[in-house]
């Protein structure tokens, strides 16, 4: 497909996100690793391109600022979970937020393979407060639709450990990873519940929950129908 992954789009810090008009669409896929997010994003991208829309796929990558700070013995001692979260949020604004805003200005459809929910869930899993983490990322471009791939911790743990070498599949490692996955899942569920109550997630974006254990083709249809409502005028139905 012509849609490409942007992993390091150049930042433009001179322009503020808040002052930019929105013309494109931002659709994000969230959920645990191995839940089918990438397949959903790729499928929607191909479907949109067949309808003449310009599509760009972005992937939420680990923060380069935090990685460099963690590798430097001089800064490592000061790299608390809160400091790391602040660095990661600033990095995300420059690497992801500003370039996404520019693409929305150009009437492109931006599909994000993980976005703010993932960042928030990771910070909460490291022991930070949910509201604090939500506020940290609320200035990112607001998604027009969040596709939440809802699964269970047990299946996610099995998928993850199955891809690891035998040396890291010990009971202790599995238990520690399981606790992390459970914290991530609890945060995803809390954000989904906030959306259901209209409480912000940190945005007032519609959320479509996709059951990862359901038929993939059925999930793909649900996702396409939700996206179709955003890109096609009311009543202008086209074949799937």
What are these regions (language model features)?
Residues 2, 8-20, 45, 158-240:
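NTP-dependent small-molecule kinase module
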Residues 53-135:
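ATP-dependent small-molecule kinase phosphotransfer cores
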Residues 55-57, 146-148, 204-209:
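Conserved beta-strand scaffold positions in the cores of enzyme catalytic domains, especially
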Residues 17-46:
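Walker A (P-loop) phosphate-binding motif
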Residues 119-187:
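A glycine- and Lys/Arg-enriched "phosphate-lid" helix/loop adjacent to the NTP-binding pocket
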């Amino acid at each position: 497909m012509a849609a490409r992954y942007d992993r390091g789009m150049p930042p433009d810090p001179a322009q503020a996100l808040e002052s930019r008009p929105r013309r494109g669409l931002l659709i994000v896929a969230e959920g645990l690793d191995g839940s089918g997010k990438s397949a959903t994003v790729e499928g929607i991208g191909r479907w949109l391109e067949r309808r003449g829309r310009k599509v760009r796929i972005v992937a939420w990558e680990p923060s380069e600022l935090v990685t460099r700070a963690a590798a430097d013995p001089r800064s490592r001692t000061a790299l608390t979970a809160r400091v790391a979260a602040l660095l990661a949020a600033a990095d995300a604004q420059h690497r992801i937020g500003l370039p996404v805003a520019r693409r929305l200005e150009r009437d492109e459809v931006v599909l994000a393979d993980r976005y703010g929910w993932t960042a928030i869930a990771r910070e909460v899993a490291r022991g930070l407060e949910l509201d604090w983490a939500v506020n940290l990322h609320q200035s990112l471009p607001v998604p027009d639709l969040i596709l939440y791939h809802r699964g269970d911790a047990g299946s996610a743990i099995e998928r993850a450990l199955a891809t690891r070498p035998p040396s890291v599949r010990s009971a202790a490692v599995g238990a520690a990873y399981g606790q992390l996955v459970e914290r991530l899942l609890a945060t995803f569920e809390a954000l989904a519940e906030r959306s259901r109550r209209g409480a912000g997630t940190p945005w007032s974006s519609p959320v479509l929950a996709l059951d990862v254990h359901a038929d993939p083709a059925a999930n793909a249809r649900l996702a396409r129908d939700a996206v179709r409502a955003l890109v096609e005028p009311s009543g202008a139905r086209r074949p799937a």
